[in-house]
Curated annotation (Swiss-Prot):
Descriptive protein name: Ribosomal RNA small subunit methyltransferase H
Enzymatic reactions: cytidine(1402) in 16S rRNA + S-adenosyl-L-methionine = N(4)-methylcytidine(1402) in 16S rRNA + S-adenosyl-L-homocysteine + H(+)
Subcellular localization(s) per the UniProt record: Cytoplasm
Tree of life domain: Bacteria
Keyword Calcium: no
Keywords (A to Z) from UniProt: Cytoplasm, Methyltransferase, rRNA processing, S-adenosyl-L-methionine, Transferase
InterPro entries noted in UniProt: RsmH (IPR002903), SAM-dep_MeTrfase_MraW_recog (IPR023397), SAM-dependent_MTases_sf (IPR029063)
Family, per entry: Belongs to the methyltransferase superfamily. RsmH family.
GO BP annotations, alphabetical order: rRNA base methylation
One GO MF term: rRNA (cytosine-N4-)-methyltransferase activity
TM spans (from-to): none
Record EC number: 2.1.1.199
Cysteine disulfide links: none
Taxonomic lineage of the native organism: Bacteria, Bacillati, Bacillota, Bacilli, Lactobacillales
Length: 316
């Protein structure tokens, strides 16, 4: 694996094996990233199987073209550089109207976190950016410097679940009135200064939740995941499966809600029987989320918050 795009794949075998791979199936890796899941999935496919890989980061696709070359040479891989919110439309362009399985590994990939200039990390000094797609218009700089007080409070509380959202938004408002806030370390210092001393003694970086909130806003992560997972459920063939790995409670709650909605009969209570068209579309493969093993947690610190949910299509 190239040094500039090093990524340790989380829940590698669990997420792929739970898809119950058919050798001649059509599959989608909605979040190509470091291509670890794709490489393992492709190793389970026969010559007639095919994998469509989505990523909005050109560097991820360039890296995967090296890593997956043997499968590319056999014509088994198609790369789609786009946000996975356009899943259905982009697959349709390739003549795909039904898939046997799809995998999501939500959140920021390790290379994006580790590339200082991308501005995702509060640990390294960099311009405020946080775009997963470097061609996108909205940046963290614009969020921090142009959103009004109420909008900042809204995203900090909604996406960061930080109880000091108002105090942090006020600090930002005061600081940017003097000069724009332009770097990650400037922002991290402001966040830290807005929190009481006893809060700073707690485990974890004081800026973590606010950086998460800004990143989610910049990339509309929850909106994209919501739209894409709903499209994926529709695209699944009968007995097809969907695996979703999440890294924070907002993503997990969204996935749990979408799976519950699709796995619950849409029928009024008291009916003597449920018509086929009102029966659930999904069946949960595992009622509780699947967590990384102790061995994986020891080997990869970033796996600690990971959860995997899997469902199977039972009605078209």
């Amino acid at each position: 694996m190239t040094n500039e795009f090093h990524h340790v794949t989380v829940l590698l075998h669990e997420a792929v094996d739970m898809l119950d791979i058919k050798p001649d199936g059509i599959y989608v890796d909605a979040t190509l990233g470091g291509s670890g899941h794709s490489a393992y999935l492709l190793s389970l496919l026969g010559d007639k199987g095919h994998l469509y890989c989505f990523d909005q980061d050109q560097k991820a696709i360039d890296h995967a073209q090296e890593q997956l070359k043997p499968y590319i040479d056999k014509g088994q891989v198609t790369f789609i550089k786009d946000n996975f919110r356009h899943l259905k439309a982009r697959l349709l362009e390739h003549g795909v109207t039904e898939i046997d399985g799809i995998l999501y590994d939500l959140g920021v990939s390790s290379p994006q976190l580790d590339e200082r200039e991308r501005g995702f990390s509060y640990k390294q000094d960099a311009p405020l950016d946080m775009r997963m797609d470097s061609q996108a218009a909205l940046t963290a700089y614009e969020v921090v410097n142009t959103y009004d007080f109420n909008d900042l409070v809204r995203i900090f509380f909604k996406y960061g679940e930080d109880k000091f959202s108002k105090q942090i938004a006020r600090k930002i408002e005061q600081a940017r009135a003097i000069k724009p806030i332009s770097t990650t370390t400037e922002l991290a210092a402001l966040i830290k200064s807005a929190k009481p001393a006893k809060e700073l003694k707690k485990k974890g970086h004081p800026a973590k939740q606010i950086f998460q909130a800004i990143r989610i806003e910049v990339n509309d992560e929850l909106g994209a995941a919501d739209a894409s997972i709903q499209q994926a459920i529709e695209l699944l063939a009968l007995d097809g499966r969907i695996s979703v790995i999440t890294f924070h409670s907002l993503e997990d709650r969204l996935t749990k809600h979408l799976f519950k909605e699709a796995s619950t009969a849409d029928a009024p209570k008291g009916l003597p029987f449920i018509p086929d068209e009102l029966k659930p579309k999904l069946e949960l493969v595992s009622r509780k989320p699947i967590l990384p093993s102790q061995k994986e947690l020891m080997a990869n610190n970033r796996a600690h918050s990971a959860k995997l949910r899997v469902a199977r299509k039972v009605r078209k």
